[in-house]
Amino acid sequence: MKKIIPICIFLTASFTTKVFAMEGWYISPGVQIGIDSKGNLHRSAQVTLGLLIEPFTTGLTIGYKWFRKFDKSGKKSWNRYNYYDLQSHALESIIQPGIGLGLIQGDNMPLTPRFKLWGGWFFLPSYEFINMKNDDSKHYFGLFGVLPLPIGVSGI
């Protein structure tokens, strides 16, 4: 019982207190590795330019995503796609949940909508839904590494 009370206090404080009290701009480079619902690898690199106004951040993201594919002979290749997202996440929660809506495009694919969810600090588990017409895999799971860097943020 003595151990449970401090744990409950910590969890209550973590989920009900404000994490940040700042405003301003930030830039956040990030990399990701993951698998799709068929077990194929994917990776990505992105840069987000965002505006931090308590209690949310909003950012524009530009990135590249590579999907590993195998042809009929078993030879692997990496197909590259460009993506553009509008992202937002809540600052007042310790788990930092976020959502992104955007478009992805490649050589063999027109602009296609994409949807992304994530949560966490610095290393973020993520889920993406991309309805690629030329592929039956639509669900993508990954782990992001990001480094948010403040640009003229007040309150630091």
Explain the meaning of each model-derived region.
Residues 32, 48-52, 85-89, 104, ...:
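Transmembrane beta-barrel domains of outer membrane proteins
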Residues 22-30, 114-120, 124-129, 155-156:
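Outer-membrane beta-barrel proteins and related beta-barrel translocases across Gram-negative bacteria
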Residues 35-39, 68-74, 105-109, 131-137, ...:
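Gram-negative outer-membrane beta-barrel proteins
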Residues 53-62, 92-99, 121-127, 149-155:
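Repeated loop/turn-to-beta-strand initiation elements of outer-membrane beta-barrel proteins
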Residues 20-72, 148:
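Short glycine/proline- and aromatic-enriched beta-strand/turn motifs that initiate or cap beta-hairpins
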Residues 138-156:
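Outer-membrane beta-barrel "beta-signal"
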Residues 23-27, 39-47, 56, 75-84, ...:
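Residues that define the transmembrane beta-barrel architecture of outer-membrane proteins
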Residues 1-23, 155-156:
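Cleavable N-terminal export/targeting peptides
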